[in-house]
Amino acid sequence: MSGKSAAKFSPAGRLTAEDLGAIHLIGAGGVGMSGLARLFLTRGISVSGSELREWPSLAGLRALGGTIHMSHEVANLDGVDTVVYSSAIPSDHLELVEARRRGLRVLHRSEALATAMTGRRTVAVAGTHGKTTTTSMVTMVLQQAGVDPSFVIGGEISEVGSGAHHGTGDYFVVEADESDRSFLIYRPFVSIITNIEADHLNTYGDLANLEAAFADFARLTDPDGFIITCADDVGGRRLAETLRAEGRRVYTYGISTDADLRLTEMASSTRGIRYLAEIDGRSLGEFRLPVPGRHMGLNSASAVLAEYLLDLPLEAAQSALAAFPGVRRRFERKGVADDVLVYDEYAYHPTPIALALRTLREVAGDGGLIVVFQPYRLYRTRDLQAEIAEALAIADELVLLEVFGPGELREPGEGSAALIEAVPLPVDRKVFVDSWDAAPVEVARRAKPGDVVVTMGAPPSSLMGDQLLDALSRRGAAGPAGTVPGGDVGGATTIGGTIPDIPGGSTPDASAAG
């Protein structure tokens, strides 16, 4: 399907989720769309969806009473009042075209989500990276405080097993997506902006336009509410200065001496991270998380600051963060095979790539670090090639897959073949594999006992963890490290890669689709 989504968004109004009638979601299996479906179903709303692949989330939707069609066809719209699509759905998708022909209400995912927020105090988390983890932390802190928030997150909280919940309380926590400007729909009571860096330049053109969009998002915050951003981030600091000059209520966090919530004595190890927090010279005590990484500490500080400003008990923040289980695909431990530890990480932008690999280096200790990376989107790989290449070189070895860019056309010289040349690693420590099945074979050939391997990048790369563990296990059963049954590296592919069981029309939705 060649058409591109041409979404034009309407601001959130007084329309409620119940006003939408029977809802149909095109591409219901991705994290963002399945979370929205779960939210509507638990509110007692009739929900159907269409998919081409049996995503793990679909069983849960069926159990809640959702109807899932394993096809895309016009008959799926019979009895439907509202059709919901994401930015990953092309404008010429047959169900989208048919919905408009029938005169059905057609809403972008963000517009549909906004209806669920009507009458609630929304806490919206935006930023170039760290959104999903931060949204999860804010959610758990509010849950621990006993306010039972509703939430929709672009990932699954590991122990909860879900990225959405319809709560009984006044608060609604949402991950706000800037990639297509749809975060400008929301009218938050609290806006959290983790950081601002160049990304989604296919939408914004340059960093200045992106920063302007984040400022516009912050200006939508309720005058009685407040804006939170990171004093340690250059973009966040600029945003705070701009908004404060306009008389808006802005609060910052970080290790910077002028941060409103100042973090001191921050220490990270393989067991997690700890820091002390103070505001206006008053100590708020010690905060600990069982996940490592300075960036995790900064993410958690925004949740602490929100809890403080909402006048909720800080003890709730301390206990919630101390038990934070992590989020699927965010520093997720997949398992161990033949004494090789395998992780999965969603990072695809240079900054989170670097942060994740540095943290994994701590985990690896004296062992090696191998990254299996699948770039996400051709435009990003092209525009940020030098920065991505430099970040990947933090690893000891690189196994590179082809770019995952559904709907994108590759120009000569673009893609992973160009990226591999730019990575400043020795030739024998980096390899571009042009077929999906070749990657586990290559990892099993390279990994030594004591090494750490991480799958990283586009959504499909999360599917490789079990294959890696299987290849490593078979290697261990077969003999010494470095030998593995299997074929040669190689094979033809396309921009999307030869990814098992993901038909071209069924890609992860926009909330997970950079």
Curated annotation (Swiss-Prot):
Keywords of the record, alphabetical order, are: ATP-binding, Cell cycle, Cell division, Cell shape, Cell wall biogenesis/degradation, Cytoplasm, Ligase, Nucleotide-binding, Peptidoglycan synthesis
Any one GO MF annotation of this record: UDP-N-acetylmuramate-L-alanine ligase activity
Q: What is its main location?
A: cytoplasm
Record keyword Cell wall biogenesis/degradation present: yes
Which pathway is this protein assigned to?
Cell wall biogenesis; peptidoglycan biosynthesis
| Substrates-to-products reaction catalysed | UDP-N-acetyl-alpha-D-muramate + L-alanine + ATP = UDP-N-acetyl-alpha-D-muramoyl-L-alanine + ADP + phosphate + H(+)
**Low complexity: compositionally biased ranges:** 495-505
What is its EC class?
A: ligase
Positions binding ATP in this chain are 127-133
Q: Name one GO cellular component term.
A: cytoplasm
- Report the EC number(s), separated by commas if there are several: 6.3.2.8
Provide the GO biological process annotations: cell division; cell wall organization; peptidoglycan biosynthetic process; regulation of cell shape
- Compartment(s) of residence: Cytoplasm
Q: Which domain of life is it from?
A: Bacteria
Q: Which Cys-Cys disulfides exist here?
A: none
Q: Where is this region: Disordered?
A: 495-514
Q: Name one Pfam family in it.
A: Mur_ligase_C
Q: State the family named in the UniProt similarity comment for this chain.
A: Belongs to the MurCDEF family.
Question: What does the record give as the function of this protein?
Answer: Cell wall formation.
Write down what this protein is called.
UDP-N-acetylmuramate--L-alanine ligase
* Natural source organism: Salinispora tropica (strain ATCC BAA-916 / DSM 44818 / JCM 13857 / NBRC 105044 / CNB-440)
